[in-house]
Regions:
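Lumenal/periplasmic acceptor-binding loop at the mouth of the active site in multi-pass
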Residues: 1-112
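Membrane-interface catalytic loops of GT-C/OST-like multi-pass glycosylation enzymes that act
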Residues: 102, 127, 144-161, 210
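Hydrophobic, aromatic-rich transmembrane alpha-helices
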Residues: 106-125, 177
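Transmembrane-helix signature of polytopic, lipid-linked glycan biosynthesis machinery
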Residues: 118-121, 136-154
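Membrane-interface junctions at the ends of membrane-embedded or membrane-associated helices
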Residues: 124, 168-192
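Hydrophobic/aromatic-rich transmembrane helices and adjacent perimembrane loops
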Residues: 152-176
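Transmembrane alpha-helical segments
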Residues: 190-210
């Protein structure tokens, strides 16, 4: 049964249930079961995981099957990655460390995007709602519409590229927020442009290096 599920072949799974319907007792999921599945799998595993791939880091390019070994997000911060994956990241085998899909951004793009999100909300709520609705409808709302099953035959991160682009708007605003804050708080005129230049160098340079 597990092998059939992992293959993602719904027809074979349905045939298996029909063939052994006298053996398997399949209970109809309740409303709360469906709600739990939506949040834990469709929202968390099939959306938030992809978002964090792009702005925190990615474990490898092997399709995830809700396991600790493949397809998870990682940050490059050892104790966080150990907590998330369930095992230390210090002595990984070479095939894991050298996987072409392995990226670590240390939360930098995500944090910069969150700074931009809160900055836009505090400075112009009307514009914030426009960007937020776009982010919502190209992300979580799309997951509700697609109603994905377990397990898909391949990763579905490409369907969410609009949501990632929208979050990138907040990353740009995060840079401007830092500039505005430093310009207001620090009297030295060259400090704010220097810090902004550092942000522009560190975050994109880290992503390009990976």
């Amino acid at each position: 049964l597990q092998a059939v599920l992992y293959a993602g072949d719904y027809e074979q799974y349905a045939q298996l249930l029909r063939r052994y319907q006298g053996v398997f007792i399949v209970e109809k999921p309740s409303f709360w079961d469906n709600l739990s599945f939506m949040f834990s799998y469709q929202f968390n595993y099939m959306y938030l995981r992809y978002l964090l791939w792009n702005f925190v880091g990615r474990q490898d390019d092997i399709q995830g099957k809700i396991s600790n070994n493949h397809g998870n997000w990682i940050s490059g911060i050892s104790f966080i990655d150990e907590w998330h994956t369930g095992y230390p990241q210090d002595h990984l085998p070479s095939d894991a460390l050298n996987n072409r899909g392995r990226n670590t951004y240390f939360f930098l793009p995500l944090l910069l995007g969150l700074v931009g999100l809160f900055f836009q909300f505090s400075s112009n709520k009307r514009q914030w709602w426009v960007v937020f609705v776009l982010f919502l409808f190209t992300g979580l709302a799309l997951k509700v519409y697609l109603n994905e099953r377990p397990f898909e035959p391949r990763e579905r991160d490409y369907a969410l590229v609009g949501s990632f682009f929208t979050f990138a708007i907040w990353i740009g605003m995060g840079v401007y927020a830092l500039y505005s804050l430093l310009e207001e708080k620090i009297s030295f005129k060259g400090m704010a442009p220097a810090v902004v230049s550092l942000c522009l160098l560190v975050v994109p340079a880290r992503m390009l290096a990976e």
